[in-house]
Amino acid sequence: MTYAYEVAVQAEAALGEGPTWDAGAQRLIWIDILGSRVHTFDPVSGRRTVMATEQHVGAAKPRVGGGLVVNLRDGVGLYGPGGESSGDSGDSGDSGGSSGPGDFRWLHREVVPGRRANDAAVAPDGALWAGTMRYDEAPGGGTLSRVAPDGTVETVLDDVAVSNGTGWSPDGRLMYYIDSPTRRIDVFDFDGQQVGGRRQLAAIEEGNGFPDGLTVDADGCVWVALWDGGAVRRYTPDGKLDRVVELPVPRPTACAFGGADLTDLYITTARTGLTAPHPLSGSVLVIPGAGKGLPQPAFAG
């Protein structure tokens, strides 16, 4: 099957990541981790917004009541409605940003020198599963934690190098997860809050890059962006490689379905670390009609 890509957002993000379709606002949310920016894009009007954060941001997801939950270097924070267009996260103290709509507050703060936030995802129950990693990507330096809407944090995995893609099967009974240096896409049994029975769904062959972000479609298949692999792959629920989407960039980072009918696959990309010019690296690509995605829950806090 041949896929035709389009450039959704021409950009020069250092480390574009975390595409998320905000169904309530009918827009795409994505981030530049190293640029400390949260971006939004309305594909109908073409309107784009950008919000600067004062810390590296690993993920930004919509909240049920409006605003955003953000996975930041020093913890998880909340922006009120309008927060995507005004206000900054505080780099010191317990709060920051402007007054009024868009106010920022910490939901959970934990300063660990040398560590930063990475990918995150909202589970079917509205909790945030937030990953971390060390800047030097040291094995065992990262974590995956469940952050409840009230701010209660439970560390689920504490022996992680680069915590990355996380997603759930259509029935919510399986959780997929990537720790990128392992080259594996793993699957867990999921009971609504806890995971168990970790096993390998698939592995990326040496020379084909590293698995990064993922999304699960309505058929239960797992789409995985391959960092340094220049492609997105689709795996069936039994781990069979089903499709390969070649891309004009070496470092796709993550993917998510969006659009009114959730059939357009948005793909974020990175420029950081490249030694040769790749004009579209750092932009957001889209493949119209690539498949059928699942509605993504908003954070319940």
Where are the regions a protein language model picked out?
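Short loop/turn segments that connect beta-strands within beta-propeller blades
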Residues: D42-G46, G80-E84, V147-G151, D189-Q193, ...
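Conserved beta-strand positions in repeat-built beta-propeller and related beta-rich domains
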Residues: A23, L28-L34, R63, L68-D74, ...
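A short beta-strand motif characteristic of beta-propeller blades
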Residues: A4-Q10, G46-A52, F104-E110, T152-D158, ...
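Hydrophobic alpha-helical segments and helix pairs
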Residues: G102-D158
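Loop/turn-rich, solvent-exposed surfaces of beta-rich toroidal or solenoidal domains
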Residues: R183-R184, A203-P237
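A short loop-to-beta-strand structural motif that recurs across blades of beta-propeller domains
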Residues: R37-H39, G75-G77, G142-S145, R184-D186, ...
